[in-house]
Amino acid sequence: LHLVLKYGTSIFVIENFGDKATEKLWNGERTRFPSGLIQRAIDKLNMLSSAHTLEDLRIPPSNRLEALKGKRVGQHSIRINDQWRLCFRWVGGNAHEVEITDCH
């Protein structure tokens, strides 16, 4: 499954999702996420889909890009807000297993 957005001559890809709720949000469908989270989460998904490199996600600094540890070793996350994270694996310049998680 390739989800592709085209802007000019560039193509940005989210390869796949780690859960159905995040995929539904990306596709504009109703989800279980709190209503106050939805627009900010969509903005972060768009940011992720537009990144050419992992380092692109360091801006803005409020993303707080970090490599995860423990059972999520190999994944990275950016902050949606104080409670929610967008977690993903970055492989070959693309985002894989993208999911929105409640870290509390």
Question: Where are the regions that the model predicts?
Answer:
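Arg/Lys-rich, positively charged N-terminal/basic patches that mediate binding to nucleic acids
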Residues: 1-44
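Glycine-rich, flexible loop/turn motifs
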Residues: 13, 29, 53, 61-64, ...
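Amphipathic alpha-helical interface surfaces
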Residues: 18, 37, 41-44, 64, ...
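Enriched for short, Lys/Arg-rich terminal
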Residues: 1-11, 69, 76-104
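Short low-complexity stretches enriched in small and charged residues
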Residues: 44-45, 54
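Conserved phosphate-interacting/catalytic interface
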Residues: 48
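A short, surface-exposed loop/turn module that caps and links secondary-structure elements
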Residues: 52-76
